[in-house]
Structure formats: C-alpha cells, structure tokens
Design a protein with these regions (language model features):
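Alpha-helical lid/collar subdomain of P-loop NTPases
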Residues: 196-358
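Exposed alpha-helical structural elements
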Residues: 5, 9, 99, 103, ...
Length: 501
C-alpha cells in the first residue's frame, strides 16, 4: 500500500485497539493487539505518518531509533535484590525499568493521557545482542520484567534487505505475532501530500510531468544512488528558503538532495525553466489584479504559442499561487478560531493574565516534547499567546489592566483582528475569479482547464474555502466541463448504437 493508505491503517488500528465497552474496558483483547510493522524503502515517510496520526488523534508519541540502543538501555540495568524462598534467603538478579518503558510512563505523567503510540524505528537493524530482546518485545510486549502499559499501540518500521545490509530477518514465530504492512513509494500520494504541505511548485509540477523520477535506489561499483520522498521535501524547503533570501540555486545544491546525476540535472533544468515562466507570465500580478488589458493580451498570446511543457507549467504556477492564498486564509481562519477559544478560556478563569499565559506555555512545552501537535501548530499557538500578551500590555497602558475593563479591551482588539480574515477571503475569491477566466481566454475549455479544476478540487485548502464561502467562477467551470463530459458520453453511446446496427 502507499504511504497514505498505511497512515489510515495505523489510525484505524489505534481506534480499534482503544475502543472501550460501557464499563470502560478495552473491547480488543490485549493479547490480540498485534504490533504494526511498516516495511518499506527509506525516505518514503514512515516516521512522518506515525507522527501525524499521533497528532491528529491527540495521543502522545514515544519514538526510538533502535540502532542507537544496546540491550542494557532496552531491558534495563541488572541489580541485586534480596529474596526469601522456602525459608531460605537468596540474592537474586533483577533489572531496573527499561529506558523505553520508562519513557512511556513519563509521557503518561506529563500529558495526563493513558494511551499513546510507541514507535520503534529501524527495528530489523538492531545489534546481535539486542535482537532477541526485540523479538521478545514484539511477541510479549515486555522488556525484561516490565510490560508496556495497556492502551499503547506498538508501531515498528524497517527497511527491506535490498536497501540495508544490516537487516536481520524475523523468524516465523515473530512474524505470526505482528501485522506486516508493506509500504511502497507512491508518486501520487506524495503529490497529494505535497500540495497540502506547501511544497515548491516546481517540484510538484516536475513530478506530475515525470512520475518515473520520483523514487530511485540503485548501487553500482562506485557508489549508492538514491532519490527519495524525503529528499524532494527537504529540497523543497531549501529552495523556498533560498528564494526568499534571494540566494541563487546552483545545480550542485540539487545534487545534494537528489543523489542521481540524471535526475538532479534534469530537475535543475526544469526548475530554471519553471522560474523563467513564473517571471515571464507574472502570475502573481495577474491573480492580484495588477495586470492591465495589454499585459493580459500579451500573456494570452504567449500561452497560446507555448508548447505542452510551457502550458503545463503555467497551470501549475497558477495553482501554486492559489494554494498560497488558500493557505493564508486557512492560517488566518485557524488563528481567529484559536484566538477566540483562548480568550474565552481566560475569561472563564479568575486568575491574572500573566498566570494564564504561563500555564498555557507550560502546556505547549509538554505538547512539543511528546509531539501532540505539529511544529506549525505549536508556533501558531505561541503566536496567539504573544498576541494576547501584547494586548494585555496595551490594556495596562490604557488603564484597563484587569476585570471587566480588560475583557472589553481584549474583545475590541479581537474584533479588529477579524478584518484581516475578511481581507484574505476577498483575496482568495478575487484570485479564483481571475485565474479561471484567464486560462479560459488562453485555451478555451481544453485540457488545461481540466488540469486546473483537478488541482483545485484536489486541494483540501481550496475546497474548504469554496465550501464555506463559495465561488461562482469555480462552480460555473465545473458545470461547463460536466456538460462537455455528458455530451461526449452521449456521443459515444450514439456511435456504439450506430455500429451495432
């Protein structure tokens, strides 16, 4: 299965294992709760999906890379204990609590949550001395004398032997006690993820145009060559950072992430071409309404004269800008909702604003440590606290530092904050109303419009906006394309009927 399907399998398993009856007992017997083993090539996102499930299901995640551990850190250190058996006194060996099990209990104490995910990466590459211990854990959910608490799902990950010489095979006894989930590198799943994650438009466009370039691992007599999903995503982040700083991107930089010369050179050429199209067409100016009639007419002629690659890139440039607008609206909307909820929580409590903000920051620290929320969510939450803190300082300067006066002051500031959200709504609506007519003028209702509507429909951010605020341009385009599809289907039925006669 692809990485997104594997993510849903983890989510569904977590929910099934944690389901409880009317008495609060787990419906799924603990002895039947098999650990999940994600087995797939490196860099496809196995670790990332486990982190995402933990955040989305609001459970703590304890993660360990097993190649960094010895038998002592997994099982615990030996200690001498005194025992009496059958009237005789003995000195016996016991073990301290496993570091891994200890981390699980710490997560439970720090978060106040009794259920979570224990993720063990590179599990089939452990040392020879640790291998029997790991097999015992997968079979019995115990390290030494200490068992994993109830309510914790074990997810392990590893690479097949062809990708790692250090791999150890599991025996049939272990395999019969786990759920082996093979994970494949999927270009389509990556594009879906990348569009929502805000990856660089050149990468999304290139991989949509050349899906065979998405993933590659090979070895020759000189070196190992590889191109992975992780490499594409990390390259995307650096490209965006370099562009924001005005730093030129060289071909050697691309090769640091795409370790296959043919692919790195080919993508670098496309990246430069994509950038030149972006500058030549002025997509940002078109969607922002800053282009005059002569400018639009010139770009229309340019697009109509372009080859398939140029047209494909133009549509993707427009989609990239639309995704930026949708993301900006989504951030503003989420900010306003979270800001309102945080302020309401403060109004309900009787303490000072300073104590409230300190408690919230402590809670954020716990969420950060156990990955209960994404880095972006935590950054946004910290930004909300800083904003309320700033408003609190302004309230003191206005002699409205506490009580009902402070509440009125904060509510007034919040009302002003909502205007920024309205600006993002107007921006997104206008961009859709300009993008669709522009491409229609350029290409009619051709394949370019189908590509545009597919990109919009496949974007959760844009569809969430349209579902909430509507878009006459989008709905009209959908109607036209659906009519064309129905007409084509009717013509095909007529043709078949004539052929039968």
């Amino acid at each position: 299965m692809n990485i997104q399907q594997a993510k849903e399998e983890i989510r569904n398993t977590l929910r099934a294992y944690l389901q409880k009856d009317g008495e609060g007992k787990y419906c799924f017997p603990t002895v039947r709760q098999r650990p999940l083993l994600l087995m797939g090539p490196p860099g496809v996102g196995k670790t990332a999906i486990v982190e995402q499930v933990a955040r989305e299901e609001q459970v703590p995640l304890v993660a360990y890379t097993m190649t960094h551990h010895t038998r002592q850190s997994a099982v615990g250190l030996p200690k001498i204990a005194e025992r009496d058996y059958c009237g005789r006194h003995f000195s016996v060996t016991e073990y301290t609590m496993s570091e891994i099990i200890g981390a699980v209990y710490e997560a439970m104490d720090r978060t106040g949550k009794r259920e979570g995910i224990l993720f063990l990466d590179e599990i089939n590459c452990v040392s020879e001395t640790l291998a029997p211990t790991m097999l015992q854990f997968l079979q019995n959910k115990t390290f030494g004398n200490h068992a994993l608490p109830e309510g914790w799902l074990i997810v392990a990950a590893g690479n097949p032997p062809e990708y790692n010489k250090s791999v150890r095979d599991f025996n049939i006894v272990t395999l019969d006690r786990i759920r082996n989930i093979p994970v494949e590198a999927s270009q389509q799943a990556f594009l879906t993820y990348g569009a929502e994650a805000g990856l660089h438009g050149a990468i999304l466009s290139y991989l949509a145009l050349k899906p065979e370039k998405f993933y590659h691992v090979s070895r020759d007599e000189n070196a190992l060559h590889y191109v992975t999903a992780r490499g594409w995503e990390d390259l995307s982040r650096l490209l965006q950072s370099y562009e924001s700083l005005g730093i030129p991107v060289e071909e050697a930089l691309v090769g640091e992430f795409l370790n296959l010369e043919e692919t790195s050179r080919d993508f670098y050429d496309y990246y430069r071409l994509y950038g030149s199209y972006g500058r030549d067409y002025g997509v940002r100016e078109i969607l922002a309404g800053e282009a005059d009639t002569a400018f639009l007419a010139d770009r229309k002629a340019m697009a109509q004269a372009g080859d398939f690659t140029e047209r494909f890139a133009l549509v993707n440039l427009i989609l990239e800008q639309l995704r930026r607008y949708a993301a900006a609206y989504g951030r503003e909307d989420a900010l306003d909702v979270a800001l309102h909820e945080t302020m309401q929580a403060f109004f309900r409590q009787n303490g000072s604003l300073e104590d409230f903000l300190a408690a919230r920051r402590n809670a954020l620290q716990t969420k950060r440590q156990f990955r209960l929320e994404s880095a972006d969510s935590l950054t946004a939450a910290e930004g909300i606290l800083r904003k309320i803190e700033q408003w609190g300082l302004e309230a003191k300067q206005a002699r409205c530092g506490d009580g009902a006066a402070l509440e009125r002051f904060l509510k007034a500031r919040f009302d002003g904050q909502l205007e920024s959200r309205q600006g993002k709504i107007r921006q997104m609506t206008a961009a859709l109303d300009r993008a669709i007519p522009f491409l229609t003028d350029c290409f009619g209702d051709g394949q370019e419009l189908t590509l545009l509507i597919t990109g919009i429909t496949g974007s959760k951010g844009m569809m969430a906006f349209i579902a909430r605020h509507g878009s006459d341009s989008y709905l009209a385009l959908c109607g036209r394309l659906q009519c064309q599809k129905n007409e084509a289907q009717l013509q095909e039925l007529c043709r078949r009927a004539v052929e039968k006669k």
